[in-house]
Amino acid sequence: MTAPQTPNSFRTGPDERGRFGIFGGRFVAETLMPNILELERAYAEAKADPAFQAEMDSYLTHYVGRPSPLYFAERMSAHFGGAKIYFKREELNHTGSHKVNNVLGQILLARRMGKPRIIAETGAGQHGVATATLCARFGLKCVVYMGAVDVERQKPNVFRMKMLGAEVVPVQSGTRTLKDAMNEALRDWVTNVADTFYCIGTVAGPHPYPAMVRDFQAVIGRETKEQMLALEGRLPNSLVACIGGGSNAMGLFHPFLDDREVEIYGVEAAGRGVSTGLHAASLTGGRPGVLHGNRTYLLMNEDGQIADAHSISAGLDYPGIGPEHAWLHEMGRVTYLSATDQETLEAFRLCSLLEGIIPALEPAHALAKVAELAPTKPRDHLMVVNLSGRGDKDIPQVAEILGDAL
């Protein structure tokens, strides 16, 4: 097979059909096409409207609390003895993760489109909390679909969503995790097309969602560029972020894709090890297929059926990946690694002890690979890790796993 030709720019996708190379597109029921086309038109109009961007910027500053700091992790850098490690502190955003960046954009778009009812899927609950928060702020009805397994392991976030006025629907079908929550949300959308806006939480789904979510999250990378130039007078040498669907990673990576000298690493969830089959590493252990309206790398069994994903982290427990990541993987622009549950727990503990910051289990996957990458780099190597969420939501789960080991 001929290797794909390197493009002049990695930042021009998707094409007019919503594709990144062979990935992406929109594979949806005919009943959903009017919704999708309406959304595509509305987003194109909003993007071209300076008033929409000005409103979004105002809320990002005064409600979300941006810009988030770029923090030098001095003790962690000394501990590994190689790269100079910086954290992009997305966990300091209102609601505790990067998710709010995208939700704000979509909720402002829903208001612009006159949609009073918002539905969302959630895994770890962070996207659900962000959606419930902004629905409360703007007086919109909010319904969040969440796998029954995730409802159990993310109880603090379930309570938060209910406190914010959202209806949380536990999904009992399939593996009762994120994939199944997304299936139910899509079913709801087909049934309630007239008044409902589907707020997708990651860079997946049918076009225009992967590009739209990426655009709303790209504030992370734009700020990182400005902040690193101000702090160090140059761009970082490398970027590291965890990947489930991959929105926090795409938000950090996208503004740097054409800076060829910047190494970029995405970290998938290897669960109990890719060789065990109990993992969520779609690029490492999957192959191309179609799920939730787009073509991408998926975990599948021999019959082509979607396989169950496993991760200690509810937010990475998804059997696919955003189509732009699949394309960047095939183009070789981004290096995709994976971290096991055990490596992640160790990184979770180490970050807490060295920096006084308890990370979410999701970015702890990225930190697990920093532990391998940083010592191999020279001391003037600038490495940025996207600390995409805080660990409050994970404390009960980690306490149960570690028990008296703390």
Curated annotation (Swiss-Prot):
<protein>
    <recommendedName>
        <fullName>Tryptophan synthase beta chain</fullName>
        <ecNumber>4.2.1.20</ecNumber>
    </recommendedName>
</protein>
<keyword id="KW-0456">Lyase</keyword>
<dbReference type="GO" id="GO:0004834">
    <property type="term" value="F:tryptophan synthase activity"/>
</dbReference>
<dbReference type="GO" id="GO:0005737">
    <property type="term" value="C:cytoplasm"/>
</dbReference>
<comment type="function">
    <text>The beta subunit is responsible for the synthesis of L-tryptophan from indole and L-serine.</text>
</comment>
<dbReference type="InterPro" id="IPR006654">
    <property type="entry name" value="Trp_synth_beta"/>
</dbReference>
<keyword id="KW-0057">Aromatic amino acid biosynthesis</keyword>
<dbReference type="InterPro" id="IPR001926">
    <property type="entry name" value="TrpB-like_PALP"/>
</dbReference>
<keyword id="KW-0822">Tryptophan biosynthesis</keyword>
<comment type="subunit">
    <text>Tetramer of two alpha and two beta chains.</text>
</comment>
<comment type="pathway">
    <text>Amino-acid biosynthesis; L-tryptophan biosynthesis; L-tryptophan from chorismate: step 5/5.</text>
</comment>
<comment type="similarity">
    <text>Belongs to the TrpB family.</text>
</comment>
<dbReference type="InterPro" id="IPR036052">
    <property type="entry name" value="TrpB-like_PALP_sf"/>
</dbReference>
<dbReference type="Pfam" id="PF00291">
    <property type="entry name" value="PALP"/>
</dbReference>
<keyword id="KW-0663">Pyridoxal phosphate</keyword>
<dbReference type="InterPro" id="IPR023026">
    <property type="entry name" value="Trp_synth_beta/beta-like"/>
</dbReference>
<keyword id="KW-0028">Amino-acid biosynthesis</keyword>
<feature type="modified residue" description="N6-(pyridoxal phosphate)lysine">
    <location>
        <position position="99"/>
    </location>
</feature>
<dbReference type="InterPro" id="IPR006653">
    <property type="entry name" value="Trp_synth_b_CS"/>
</dbReference>
